[in-house]
Every structure is written in structure tokens, then in C-alpha cells.
Amino acid sequence: MRTLPIFVIFAALLVSSPHAAELDVYGGFTDIKGEKTGFFHTEKIDGRWWLITPEGNAFWGIGMAHPITGFTQSAVTFVYDGDQQAWLKGSIELMRGLGYNCVWSGPYCPERLQSDFVDRSLAEEVFREAKIPYVFPLPILKHSVEMVPGEKRPDVFSDRFAAFVNKLVAEHVPRLKDDRWVMGYYYGFAPWMDDVTWLNDLIERKDSPGRERLLGVLERRYEGNIEALNAVYGTSFQSFEQLKQSGALIVYPDWVKRHKMGYAPMAEAAGSQKLYDDAQALLGEIVEHTYRIAHDAVRRHDQNHLIFGCYIKEASLNLENWKRIGPYIDVIAPQHVSQVFPIDPVVEALDKPAFISDQPFGNVYPLPLVTAKNAPGAVPDHLDRLVLYDLLANRISKDPNFIGVDFCAVLFDQSHEDKAYEIGQPGFYTKYGEPKQPLCETVIGFNEQMLSHLREPMSGEELELLDRQFHETLDRYRAVMRDRKGFLLRNPRVSYR
């Protein structure tokens, strides 16, 4: 097994930080007091939301979203001689050394386990003994990248789905319910990002509980007036009963999703707004039912730990749908800082804090991947990643509505070859264990700065300025990468490294 000496340097920097002596065993600030309950929970103190440690001290979580994945196999081989236990323990220490004080994704990232490489039981055991705060995954739903060709979304209204959720929860929660290092539970990453597919998958199943439930919602929304529905959807049903019994489809087009995410305008056809509103109401029915089933299953075994729900794309749910799931979550968990759907109104409406659950800060891919495949979040250089990280660290840590952030990052360069997203996502270390020292050292400083910013929350106007600076910078990088890709596609003989 290779030794990674850079960690010793990083750890020394952290130990010498001005905050080190002020922290309790969990990483909470001993001079900012909340209620001592014996478990992580949330409180609003002097206008700022905090996590509160089991000892009753304020905590703000900084993590990386994807430290333990199945696409780290090369690093396990080259750095840890194939020893998964050494890799798991070493990864926790490397995260600590970089200034990450918790693991929001837990012992493994469910959406990046397609290869079945990670020994999940071993990972759970290592994390139980690691004494680092973490959130445990209860993956009741899949990310779209986990879906195999032809696989449909589950009918969440079926008895089969309820039994699956109850079984999954019963396998894990009873043994975790008294663990003080567990902050809570989450249900997986981004299942609602493809909401149109969810609606169409459930409606097309004839005689299914999901179809019956969703068509019933539509019948109530149109007050039983089938002609009104026909006018919106361009159909010719004689009655809602005919619609239900025929097996015929109401299909939701892709523009619904693209419009909600800010990528496309509202369609111009008559009835488009009504169709769009119908889609949001149906999605709300699906999401609320799913969260209620999962919440009730968890609370049968555990009354204390936090429930985060899914780590969802920030515009997946409108305000009304956030309100629908409010009773079943303790923390709001959008993935990104968003201009399309700012989360502040949700925090205010639910009177619950938020944390950013999978925040990208740019990825550096080999240029052949940028030109040949979809390489999400590409930026020219690792320096540009630091530019975005700095802007985000300021924006998020100075916002009193956030209790933490999970950066979309990996420890080691990913080595899977199926998709650019997986083969190209860069880590803080190469797959041979070589540190990217300027990146590592700078991120340590930024993570430390975030902890100092917590005592200096900004006003709404100041936060808007930071938010605008970040998004304007991100848009410029996107434009540069579009220009690069266009140039290279037009000039395939140009050589580059």
C-alpha cells in the first residue's frame, strides 16, 4: 500500500487552525449552544440555522458528495493493493485532511455502485467505527444513471413498493437508531430530475395503482369535465371512465421538464400552462406519497435522527410540492445553488433549514471526452475549479439558511469507462495516489474560511451579489467550453494534449 504523505501536512494545518480548540468531539463550536439532545438536530440561533451536535453545540457540515464509489477501483488497486478496508479508512482520513468534517453521502454513494465493486457491509462497518458525522443512505429510488435499458420507474402507490421500503428501512435503521455519529438518513440522489418519465411510466401501466391514482387526480382537477381535459391534451375521450378503462395514454412532453429547469420557454400551444400545472400536481402526488411511506417506515424504528429525503435537483419541485413533503423531512436538500429556483422561499415556508447536497464546481476532462461525449460541468483547468469553489464557499457559508454543503467531488480520479461523467471526473488525487497539491492546499484554506464566515452572515442584498457573481462566472466558463468544443469539432486535425 502506498503512503500518501501529503495528508500529514494537511492534518497539521487543520490542527493548528484557530478553530481547532473550540470544537467538540463531533466538530461543533463549543461557544454556540443549542439544546443537548444526544442526537444531531437543527436549531435556529440568532437568525442562523445550525446543525446541533449530540453535545448541544453548533455544527456546520462541509463534505464531498462522492468519496466512496465503484469507479475508484483503480485507486484501490494502485494505492491500497486491493485492500478495501485500507481504502475506506484511508479515504476518511484524506477527507479529514482536506478539511471535510462530515460525509453527507455516507458509507457509499448509491448512484455510483453499478459495478458492485464496493463491499457495502464493510463500508458500513468502517464508518460505524470512524467517529465522523455522516448521513446514511436508504436508496428507495434510483438516479437515472442507475436505470438499465428498458427499466421503468417503480409504481410508488403499489403494495410492492411499500413492502420494499419497509424491508430496506428495517434492514438498516434499527441498528443505527442509537448511533450518535449518524446525522440522519437520505433516500438517494436526484430521482425526480426526469419527472416527465415518472409521469408517463406510471400512467401507461393499465389497471395499476399508479395509473388509477394519477388519473383520479386529473379527474378532480377538471371537476369531472372530460371535454375540458380533451381541450388541453388534444384527446377525444367520452368520459373519465373511458380514459381509465381504455388503457389509452396521456403523454407529458419533454418540454415540461426543460421549462421547469429553465432550459426552454413554455410551449405556445393552447392549454400548455394547464398541462404544465397538471404535471406538477401529479408529480406532487407521487413525491408526497413516497416521502410519507419512507418517513413512516423510518419513524417506526427511529424517532431521533434527521430525515433529509432525496438529494434532489434544485428545480425538481415547485414551492407547493415542497410544502406537500414538508411534514416528512427535517432538512431541505437541493443539490445546487440555483437562479432558476432559489431555495429561500422554501426555507421560509417550511421553517426548516437547507443544505446544498451535490454542488458542482467544475470538472476538468480530457479534451477527447469533451468533444466526443457529454462531459457535465467542464471547465478549462483546475485553477478554474478553484475560482468557482471560492465563489461558492463564500455564497453558501454566508447564507444563514444553510447548515452545510456537499461539493460534487471525488477523492481519486474516476476510472470507469462507460461514460465521460464517470471516467473523467477529476479527484484531489490521481488514481496512483499522487496529490494535486495546489488544488488540495487551496481547498483546505477555503474550507477553513467557510467556518470563519459562519459568524458573519450576509444580508439578502449581499448574498444576491455573491449569487450573481457565481452564476455570471459559471456562464462565462460554459461559453468558453462551448467555443472549445465547436473549434475542435470543426478542426479534427488540430493536435492537443
Model-derived features: where do they sit?
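Aromatic-rich peripheral "rim/lid" segments of glycoside hydrolase catalytic domains that contact
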Residues: L202-R213, C408-R497
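Glycoside hydrolase catalytic-domain groove-lining segments
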Residues: A281-D296, R300-A375, A393-N394
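Substrate-binding cleft of secreted/luminal carbohydrate-active enzymes
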Residues: R180-G184, F189-A190, Q359, K373-F428
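Bacterial N-terminal signal peptides
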Residues: P5-V15
